Regions:
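Bacterial N-terminal signal peptides that target proteins for export
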Residues: 1-8
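Compositionally biased regions
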Residues: 4, 18-21
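Hydrophobic h-region of N-terminal signal peptides that target proteins for export
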Residues: 9-19
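C-terminal amphipathic alpha-helix
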Residues: 24-57, 119-187
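Alpha-helical segments in soluble extracytoplasmic regions
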Residues: 42-106, 111
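Surface-exposed, polar helix/loop patches in the mature regions of secreted/periplasmic/lumenal proteins
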Residues: 86-143
């Protein structure tokens, strides 16, 4: 019984050390924070451009009402991206936050692509080019974030596999040990 407890204690130490040290290729917290700062800076460059967009006037020129909705969505998605990025910066080891940030970035880029076409057609082609350039500048950050999410997911999967193997080994060790004798009650 004591060896089973010792084995489980060793297992707990192994899992704790596996979680505190990065596994092959996962970016350090410092690098992730730098990446997120760069992502936030690029996102902040989008805001003044979005503020110049006037999709309500486009509708008078024959544009679909959907552009107004997309513009409103882009404003909200920008706020969500910045909030998600801030949360990830505080806890860069959380896969759910990394995925949320990445998906919000993709959603913003897709919405802005449509809004950019509206800007080009109904407002100002130069402003559309500026929007497209700012979004394109963020491509490197998007690739780095995608790679970080992939590396983090791989690390978490490896940690889970180690923990699962060790738990199975502990269970097996405990099952092989004879049951402790039941001590009789003294009278």
């Amino acid at each position: 019984m004591k060896s089973g407890l010792l084995t489980c204690l060793v297992f707990a130490c192994v899992v704790a050390s596996a979680q505190s040290t990065p596994v092959g290729g996962v970016a350090s917290e410092w690098d992730v924070r730098k990446l997120l700062e760069s992502l936030d800076l690029q996102a902040q460059h989008v805001k003044p451009i979005i503020d110049q967009v006037k999709p309500q006037t486009w509708v008078a020129k024959g544009a679909p009402q959907a552009y107004v909705t997309q513009w409103t969505t882009a404003q909200a998605e920008l706020k969500y991206l910045l909030a998600s990025s801030e949360s990830l910066s505080k806890e860069p080891e959380r896969l759910t936050l990394a995925l949320d940030t990445y998906f919000r970035m993709q959603a913003l880029e897709l919405t802005l692509a449509s809004v950019t076409e509206g800007i080009r057609k109904y407002q100002n082609p130069a402003l559309a080019d500026l929007m497209q350039a700012v979004v394109s500048e963020n491509g490197s950050n998007a690739d780095k974030l995608r790679q970080y999410v992939q590396d983090l997911a791989t690390q978490k999967e490896q940690e889970f596999q180690i923990a699962d193997r060790e738990a199975q080994r502990c269970r097996e060790t405990l099952m092989k040990q004879p049951a402790a004798p039941i001590k009789g009650v003294r009278k």
